[in-house]
């Protein structure tokens, strides 16, 4: 799942900026699903040539997992993992992890 991490403060201060970020993640995933070779163009600007040549194949391999939604089950599983591995002392709720006011953008 993609993650766009921000703070409650940023959401309150500029919800439009946060919404734009969510829309950008969703649109990028949609574009890569249509044409994984787009990743090569971006990769050439960011990575050494050998790695840039591989990125489209990596993206194509991972396309089944390109889903912008974050389920309650996923949050619950991550929370349990964080507790079991000592990264967290207590569980967190879905509402604490996901900014509910932006969920509608996942499928827009």
Residue map of PLM features:
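Secondary-structure end/capping motifs
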Residues: 13-89
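Conserved C-terminal helix/tail region of periplasmic/extracytoplasmic solute-binding proteins
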Residues: 83-108
């Amino acid at each position: 799942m993609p993650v766009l991490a921000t703070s409650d403060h940023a959401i309150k201060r500029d919800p439009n900026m946060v919404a734009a970020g969510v829309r950008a993640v969703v649109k990028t995933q949609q574009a890569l699903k249509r044409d994984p070779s787009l990743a090569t163009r971006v990769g050439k600007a960011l990575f050494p040539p050998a790695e840039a040549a591989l990125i489209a194949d990596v993206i194509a391999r991972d396309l089944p997992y390109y889903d912008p939604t974050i389920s309650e089950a996923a949050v619950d599983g991550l929370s349990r993992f964080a507790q079991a591995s000592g990264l967290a002392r207590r569980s967190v709720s879905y509402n604490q992890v996901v900014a509910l006011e932006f969920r509608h953008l996942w499928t827009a």
